[in-house]
Design a protein with these regions (language model features):
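Active-site neighborhood of phospho(di)ester-bond hydrolases with catalytic His/Asp-centered motifs
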Residues: 21-23, 42-50, 70-73, 137-142, ...
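Short active-site oxyanion
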Residues: 1, 63-68, 134-136
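Active-site HxH/HxHxD metal-binding segment of metal-dependent hydrolases
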Residues: 34-113
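Pre-active-site segment of Zn-dependent metallo-hydrolases
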Residues: 12-51, 56-63, 112-118, 142-154
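Zn-dependent metallo-beta-lactamase
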Residues: 1-19, 26-29, 101-103, 204-212, ...
Length: 235
């Protein structure tokens, strides 16, 4: 499972050649101006919620690639009216994709969800992606919440993808607590530095995780990490 960071909260997860694109917000993001959205591969597009900074490029990429959307019923209904197709899920539900090889579970996020025009975007969510018992937890935009402690009772998460920019979501301190709740040692930070209000001190953030014997990965936009290269034990 190879994870490529495409800026803000967008990642592209390559699972043996099948691409799961998450929350594409690339073309409006000046920090990602070097990323060509016309070259992005996508078989599925996961949408955590309806805010504009998570859906800006959904239509363009899905129309070009034929990607299936995976999201809540309200967001899927919105895009079906625009001619796109996909699979609707709701909180607590799971479904298998790619001929049953990839299991995705939709889980709780504490946030809001409305489209840029103010229309209802359903419940915000996160996703657990399970492939051969390698598991990535994408929290989506969220506050720290105690339900995260349920996750390690059922799953051994290899990598968590957490927002760390504060103001709209968890900041670094809460993301570290979330890592403790989930019992995960490797965290990929997202949703930071895109706007002035969510700028962070990256070195201080990494030190905070290191002091807790965990690793915070802050990738350059366009860079990747592979689960097989991570040390899943205590760092």
């Amino acid at each position: 499972m190879k994870v490529t960071y495409l800026g803000h909260a967008c990642v592209n997860i390559d699972i043996d050649g099948t691409h799961f694109l998450v929350d594409p917000f690339i073309s409006p993001n000046p920090l990602a101006s070097h990323i060509d959205i016309n070259s992005i591969k996508a078989d599925y597009i996961l949408i955590t919620h309806a805010h504009g900074d998570h859906i800006a490029d959904v239509g363009a990429i899905a129309k070009r690639t034929g990607a299936q959307l995976i999201t809540n019923p309200e967001i899927l209904a919105h895009y079906e009216k625009l001619g796109l197709t996909g699979h609707a899920m709701n909180l607590g539900g799971s479904h298998r994709f790619v001929d049953g090889k990839v299991k995705i579970k939709m889980i709780k996020a504490e946030h809001s969800s409305s489209f840029p025009d103010g229309s209802y975007g359903g419940n915000p969510a996160g996703f657990l992606i399970d492939y051969n018992d390698d598991i990535i937890y994408i929290s989506g935009d969220t506050a720290l919440h105690y339900d995260m402690k349920i996750i390690p009772h059922q799953y051994k998460v290899n990598l968590a993808i957490f927002p760390i920019g504060n103001n709209y979501t968890m900041g670094v301190r809460d993301a570290l607590t979330a890592a403790r709740f989930v019992e995960v040692n490797n965290v990929l930070g997202v949703h930071y530095d895109t706007f002035p209000v969510i700028k962070i001190d990256k070195e201080a953030a990494k030190r905070k995780f290191k002091d807790d014997h965990r690793r915070l990965h802050l990738l350059e936009i366009g860079a990747s990490l592979d689960l097989k290269d991570l040390n899943i034990s205590t760092l």
